[in-house]
């Protein structure tokens, strides 16, 4: 749970204090964004960890018609069929929704909560903002939530969710302070705090392996590859809402 570095812009000028009001706002902790495809880990985890699918399960990734709304697509392309791991690798929207449907909203919401997306992280900073999410029992909302829209989360919540995957499925409380010195000499460490187990060790390790393949040369995150290192992650397209409605 230790945070080694965290930055936010714009910041204020330390010499003139110009921009102090704007610079005091910490975007990583206090701002909310639709996470986009980075959120597909919840769809995959809910189905795999609950036994409804494996990473080798084939998923139909053709457009999914949603009554009363626009279909879920990968426009302008269509992948046809992909494994669950392939859905992450290629970042298929209809694939993610069909995976989420295997678990259903109640189970999906359980893992949504276990990942920490329904509560503040508890970081030792003031003013932390909690997420906002549409009612997923509504089919249209569920179709959008499954690939990261119709909800808003903080960058820190997303970071801690991915940290749980790296930590074999255990979600930690984030902390900026390792400890304090009492009387300038006695160091009192701040112990790490486990919040909960969000998935089995096997699911976490298999998911981690799938995220490594997202950086393959035919994955969506190939530019994140670093020679000599195993790099895992998930691409995502964040849309910002216009004040007048719609997206930038």
For every predicted segment, state its role:
Residues 2-37, 42-248:
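Beta-lactam-recognizing serine transpeptidase/beta-lactamase-like catalytic domain environment
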């Amino acid at each position: 749970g230790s945070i080694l570095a965290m930055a936010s812009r714009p910041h204020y000028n330390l010499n003139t204090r110009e921009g102090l009001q704007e610079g005091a706002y910490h975007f990583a902790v206090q701002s909310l964004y639709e996470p986009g495809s980075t959120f597909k880990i919840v769809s995959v985890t809910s189905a795999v960890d609950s036994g409804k699918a494996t990473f080798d399960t084939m998923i139909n990734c053709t457009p999914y018609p949603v009554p009363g709304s626009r279909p879920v697509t990968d426009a302008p392309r269509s992948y046809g069929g992909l494994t669950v791991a392939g859905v992450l690798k290629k970042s298929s929207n209809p694939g993610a929704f069909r995976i989420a449907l295997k678990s259903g909203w109640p189970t999906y919401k359980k893992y949504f909560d276990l990942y920490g997306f329904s509560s503040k992280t508890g970081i030792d900073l003031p003013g932390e903002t909690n997420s906002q999410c549409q009612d997923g029992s509504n089919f249209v909302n569920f179709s959008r939530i499954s690939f990261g829209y119709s909800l808003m989360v903080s960058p820190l919540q997303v970071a801690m969710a991915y940290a749980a995957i790296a930590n074999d499925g255990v979600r930690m409380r984030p902390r900026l302070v390792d400890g304090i010195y009492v009387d300038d000499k006695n160091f009192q460490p701040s112990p790490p705090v486990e919040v909960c187990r969000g998935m089995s060790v096997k699911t976490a390790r298999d998911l981690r392996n799938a995220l490594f393949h997202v950086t393959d040369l035919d994955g969506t995150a190939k530019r994140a590859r670093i020679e000599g290192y195993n790099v895992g992650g998930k691409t995502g397209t964040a849309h910002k809402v216009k004040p007048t409605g719609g997206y930038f």
